Amino acid sequence: MTKVVGVYSGKVAQWRGNGKRFETAIFKTRVAGIVAITMSGITDDFQADQVHHGGPDKALCLFASEQYNNIEKQLALSLPRPAFGENLLVSGVDDGELCIGDILYIGTTKLQVSQPRRPCYKISAVHGEPKLAHFFQQTGYTGCYLRCLEPGQLQAGDEIMWHHGEETRVSILDVNRILYGKEIDPQLINQLLLLKSIAPSLRATLRKRLEGTEVDDRRRLYGEFDETTRESV
């Protein structure tokens, strides 16, 4: 059964370590009982970087619980749940199955898959594993963002009723391969650009990819980047 394992929210906090200092809301805690979901997500959930997080196309962040075992095994880590700032930890479905536009009915809410999560250096920093964000990106199992089509209530243990939302099926895993793969697939990118439910920010990134414009992900993956030494600082 596809279901919600946990619901989480968090506040903005200062983090310092490994030569880095930043604000983050990655440290989320379990929300017990029934949780109200608005068009903006969970009322008591906050984002430190409101340029890259939050907003109607990123109302909630979803991550598959099954991926934790793979990450811990591959990188020899022991991780708390949640570890990556997700709002919904789910079981029974993952990024290889969830597609852009898919509709998720959870509790009394109606949610829609809008785009993959794009991992950043803060995930690596707080867990003391420099390779973590890049590992997410390379595997393609990044988790995804949801928009709220109909506000309502949900809670841990709720079953997820999952329906296809677009005639053309492109999974979160496939989108990540398009974004980060060495080869450009113009046909698949054009199929994605035709989807009505694709998030505008993802649409813009895909157009750059199609045009052959190189997107420098080093700052996102490693933080401040020193061009003279070509190392993150």
Segments predicted by a language model, with ranges:
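Active-site glycine-rich loop that binds ribose-phosphate moieties when present
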Residues: H127-H134, Q138-C148
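Short loop/turn positions at the edges of beta-strands in beta-sheet-rich folds
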Residues: G92-D94, G140, E150
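Glycine-centered loop/turn positions within well-structured domains
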Residues: N69, T142, G152
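Loop/turn positions that initiate beta-strands
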Residues: G101, A156-G157
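Electropositive, beta-rich accessory/interaction domains or terminal extensions
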Residues: M1-A125, K131-L132, H164-V233
